[in-house]
């Protein structure tokens, strides 16, 4: 029988950051308070990622200051999620790299944890009480080449050792001078005129467009800075010192944008005035070649890294409760759901029931189904399906750290999964007209028996409309007509507003359906998802989820309790 079914849940259950948290973008910076749906942020993989959902401002939530080993402090709510490694997972990763992770205690890897969970396990339960959680550095920003008036290396050399008010470079090293002359020989106009045009003459700083150049261009810029004013420590770390605070901040951003952890220290020096009496020293570690100047590159190689510093990640050194502040949630469209936050560019985190419907229809009962996914990519959906069917942790699949037992389970399920009549369409900006046309073709071609749309709030009509509520109402009516025309169930995933969070019991109601009351009116069935342990980690019903059948046009309403196995991307019946 055909039916129009709405499945609704809260978006992310409140993974929120303070409104003033800086967020890097492909063109500069924004904040959690200013970012809007459709804007681009940067993911942990260094690539631009689009904001697909952003909540209203949330008040009265328990908040924490999360402090990292490089001095970065981020204010987040208790439910905000971080992808962290623990002492156990770091040992497991080392075992995996060495090829002997065959034991259960060597199969724990990085996992998503809330701020509250990290606060409770901040230090290891060992005699030395060492720090437990670390966050792996983001990859170097992956951005396109730009056209620059001043070549990046030349700008870096001038910023490091040039006269602020003129185009004079005081470096005596002939290798640097020869490279600058070679770069400027093919340009028209003087270096001084070009420095004035980009706004740095008399005001030393790195223009934003240079900080968002390609990785190669940013490495050339940093090489110019280090060749003129960089040093190497006894342990092989790279240092850059300057008394210009703005330039120090810009160079720190440049270093972080290349995927390195940057530590900043200060000390008093004898300067001409107060503003030049503080020296800022930036320190970072890498095995890569950072100097273009041959003698410095050789010197760094000679002072090889001692290997005692964990330079690929930041440790969380403290998680302390603070007074509640206004916070906001952001959701991005990349597969890992990670985006960068703060000036240090720390990676931070951001639907399972719809996939359970598909698995039951196509894999268990061999009937054709289709999901039109506006949120997740095809590869992400397939990975979640494999995780759920083979009962393998999604985090292990993503990281490529599956055990021999995991591979065996996956191999056993692959033939059945690969033969399932399951169709996935992750086309961007799908309209209702396109969904109807594709669903009709599948009905004729493969005897389609189920349609899932994930999710309604990401759909667009492609037309100018008077209000978003009217647009969602039209989607609701069109889905109803589609279900009736094809005579198949149409399951539409929807978001709830933040109403449940204001109630004592946190349970969702029909009135919480987001952006349109038409969803409630048009649907034959509405299922609301509720997870008691989403707000209270120590809730006695931890691990349970409620499917609240809030509307059923042709039958009774009821609440069904199931077990959530989110690490396996699935819900399961409760054990009896």
From Swiss-Prot:
Mod. after translation: This protein undergoes a protein self splicing that involves a post-translational excision of the intervening region (intein) followed by peptide ligation.
GO biological process: DNA replication, synthesis of primer; intein-mediated protein splicing
Record keyword Transport present: no
Occurrences of domain DOD-type homing endonuclease (ranges): 154-260
EC number: 5.6.2.3, 3.1.-.-
Location of the SF4 helicase domain: 313-576
Keywords: ATP-binding, Autocatalytic cleavage, DNA replication, DNA-binding, Helicase, Hydrolase, Isomerase, Nucleotide-binding, Primosome, Protein splicing
Isomerase listed as a keyword: yes
UniProt xrefs under PROSITE patterns: INTEIN_ENDONUCLEASE (PS50819), SF4_HELICASE (PS51199)
Alphabetical list of PANTHER family matching this protein: REPLICATIVE DNA HELICASE, REPLICATIVE DNA HELICASE DNAB
Summary of the function given for this chain in its UniProt record: The main replicative DNA helicase, it participates in initiation and elongation during chromosome replication. Travels ahead of the DNA replisome, separating dsDNA into templates for DNA synthesis. A processive ATP-dependent 5'-3' DNA helicase it has DNA-dependent ATPase activity.
Family, similarity comment: Belongs to the helicase family. DnaB subfamily.
Stated name of the protein: Replicative DNA helicase DnaB
Organism, as annotated: Mycobacterium intracellulare
Gene, per the UniProt record: dnaB
């Amino acid at each position: 029988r055909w039916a129009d079914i709405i499945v609704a849940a809260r978006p992310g259950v409140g993974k929120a950051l303070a409104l003033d948290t800086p967020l890097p973008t492909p063109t500069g910076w924004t904040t959690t308070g200013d970012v809007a749906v459709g804007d681009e942020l940067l993911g942990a993989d260094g690539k631009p990622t689009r904001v697909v959902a952003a909540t209203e401002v949330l008040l009265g939530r328990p908040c924490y200051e999360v402090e990292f080993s490089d001095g970065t402090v981020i204010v987040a709510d208790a439910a905000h999620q971080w992808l962290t490694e623990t002492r156990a997972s770091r040992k497991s990763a080392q075992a995996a790299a060495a090829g002997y992770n065959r034991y259960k205690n060597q199969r724990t890897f990085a996992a998503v944890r809330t701020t509250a969970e990290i606060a409770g396990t901040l230090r290891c339960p060992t005699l030395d009480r060492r720090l437990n959680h670390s966050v792996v550095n983001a990859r170097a920003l992956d951005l396109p080449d730009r056209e620059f008036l001043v070549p990046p290396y030349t700008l870096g050399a001038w910023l490091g050792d040039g006269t602020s008010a003129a185009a004079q470079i005081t470096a005596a090293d002939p290798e640097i001078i020869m490279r600058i002359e070679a770069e400027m020989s093919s340009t028209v106009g003087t270096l001084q005129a070009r420095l004035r045009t980009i706004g740095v003459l008399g005001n030393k700083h790195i223009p934003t467009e240079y900080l968002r150049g390609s990785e190669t261009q940013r490495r050339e810029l940093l090489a110019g800075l280090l060749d003129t004013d960089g040093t190497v420590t006894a342990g092989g770390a790279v240092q850059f010192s300057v008394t210009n605070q703005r330039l120090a901040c810009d160079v720190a951003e440049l270093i972080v944008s290349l995927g390195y952890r940057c530590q900043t220290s200060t000390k008093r020096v004898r300067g001409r005035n107060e503003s030049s009496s503080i020296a800022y020293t930036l320190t970072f570690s890498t095995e890569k070649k950072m100097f273009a100047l041959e003698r410095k590159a050789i010197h760094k190689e000679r002072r090889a890294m001692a290997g005692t510093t964990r330079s690929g990640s930041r440790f969380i050194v403290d998680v302390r409760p603070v007074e509640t502040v206004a916070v906001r949630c952001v959701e991005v469209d990349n597969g890992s759901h990670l985006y960068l936050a703060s000036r240090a560019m720390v990676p931070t985190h951001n639907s399972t029931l719809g996939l359970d419907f598909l698995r039951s229809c196509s894999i268990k009962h061999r009937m054709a189904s289709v999901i039109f996914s506006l949120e997740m990519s095809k590869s992400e959906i397939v990975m979640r399906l494999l995780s759920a069917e083979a009962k393998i942790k999604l985090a292990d699949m993503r990281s490529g750290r599956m055990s021999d037992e995991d591979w065996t389970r996956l191999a056993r399920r692959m033939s059945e999964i690969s033969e399932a009549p399951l169709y996935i369409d992750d086309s961007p900006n799908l309209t209702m007209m396109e969904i109807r046309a594709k669903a009709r073709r599948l009905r004729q071609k493969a005897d389609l028996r189920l349609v899932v749309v994930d999710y309604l709030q990401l759909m667009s009509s492609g037309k100018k409309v008077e209000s978003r509520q009217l647009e969602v109402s039209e989607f609701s009516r069109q889905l109803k007509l589609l279900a009736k025309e094809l005579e198949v169930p149409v399951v539409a995933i929807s978001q709830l507003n933040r109403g449940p969070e204001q109630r004592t019991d946190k349970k969702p109601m029909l009135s919480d359906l987001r952006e349109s009351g038409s969803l409630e009116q048009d649907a034959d069935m509405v299922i609301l998802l509720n997870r008691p342990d989403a707000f209270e980690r120590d809730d006695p019903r931890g691990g349970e989820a409620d499917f609240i059948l809030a509307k059923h046009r042709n039958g009774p309403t009821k609440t069904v309790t199931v077990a959530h196995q989110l690490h396996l991307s699935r819900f399961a019946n409760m054990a009896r």
